[in-house]
């Protein structure tokens, strides 16, 4: 996809691994970076996304679905989950556009990731769009703890999985209360979702601290994103 910002940028898609406590692959998030035409400048999606038009967001979402289609047998063979971020602007389109809905619904291993800044998230199941999405697709709250939402949507059972925000984790990790605080979160949230995951695992030391705390999966700089050509390496030992 080509995005028109101060200059033209093209999207490049990668797979961000999510591991279990034994460092076995359980799933992959499809993420995008944006590179200038000359390749000299690269920007992550979170910096570019606020400047993308609805049409550009739609094109990026479709591009991710197309990539997923090319490697769906890899996900099925290895029983992996795929996560795609769902921008708020695409939510209604996904429910209203039958072709887009069908393209996303064909993947039984696909889950849609939603951020805490999703409009009306604090309404929980009273948010009609969010409730309808949860009826048709497994949802993941991708950055719980970023400070932009309450726990209502979680306790309403809208999310199959919840991922703790990486910045939240890295700030808390510096405190001596990190372990008991994480145990408290696990105890509070686990009954409201199928899987509670943790981001911000950038080192072996951090992985060793987090692994015994009751989380089902882990994500971070310890397992960097890879292009589609390197997917097979993630399941080799």
UniProtKB/Swiss-Prot annotation:
| Coiled-coil intervals, chain numbering | none
Q: Which residues form the signal peptide?
A: none
Boundaries of every EAL domain copy: 1-237
Keyword Transcription regulation in the entry? The reply is: yes
InterPro entries hit by this protein: EAL_dom (IPR001633), EAL_sf (IPR035919)
Family matches, as Gene3D superfamilies: EAL domain (3.20.20.450)
Keyword terms, alphabetized? Repressor, Transcription, Transcription regulation, Virulence
Classify the source by domain of life: Bacteria
Q: Which Pfam families match?
A: EAL
What does the subunit section of this Swiss-Prot or TrEMBL entry state?
A: Interacts with FlhD in the FlhC(2)FlhD(4) heterohexamer, inhibiting its ability to activate transcription.
User: Which family does the entry's similarity section mention?
Assistant: Belongs to the YdiV family.
Q: What does this protein do?
A: Acts as an anti-FlhC(2)FlhD(4) factor by binding to FlhD, decreasing its ability to bind DNA, and thus negatively regulates expression of flagellar class II operons, decreasing motility in nutrient-poor medium. Required for resistance to host phagocyte oxidase.
Q: What is this protein called?
A: Anti-FlhC(2)FlhD(4) factor YdiV
Q: Which gene encodes it?
A: ydiV
């Amino acid at each position: 996809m080509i995005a028109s910002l101060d200059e033209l940028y093209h999207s490049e898609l990668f797979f961000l691994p999510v591991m279990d406590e034994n460092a076995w692959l359980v799933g992959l998030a499809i993420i995008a970076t944006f590179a200038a035409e000359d390749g000299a400048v690269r920007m992550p999606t979170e910096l570019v996304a606020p400047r993308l038009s609805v049409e550009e967001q739609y094109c990026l979402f479709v591009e991710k679905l197309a990539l997923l289609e090319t490697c769906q047998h890899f996900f099925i063979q290895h029983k992996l989950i795929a996560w795609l971020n769902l921008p708020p602007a695409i939510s209604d389109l996904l429910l209203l556009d039958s072709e887009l809905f069908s393209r996303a619904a064909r993947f039984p291993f696909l889950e849609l990731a939603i951020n805490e800044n999703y409009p009306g998230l604090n309404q929980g199941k009273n948010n009609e769009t969010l409730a309808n999405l949860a009826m048709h697709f497994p949802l993941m709250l991708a950055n719980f703890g970023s400070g932009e939402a309450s726990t209502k949507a979680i306790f309403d059972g809208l999310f199959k999985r919840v991922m703790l925000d990486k910045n939240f984790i890295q700030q808390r990790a510096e405190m001596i209360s990190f372990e008991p605080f994480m145990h408290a979160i696990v105890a509070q949230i686990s009954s409201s979702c199928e899987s509670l995951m943790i981001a911000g695992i950038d080192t072996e030391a951090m992985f060793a601290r987090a692994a015994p705390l009751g989380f089902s999966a882990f994500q971070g700089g310890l397992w960097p994103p890879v292009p589609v050509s390197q997917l097979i390496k993630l399941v080799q030992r």
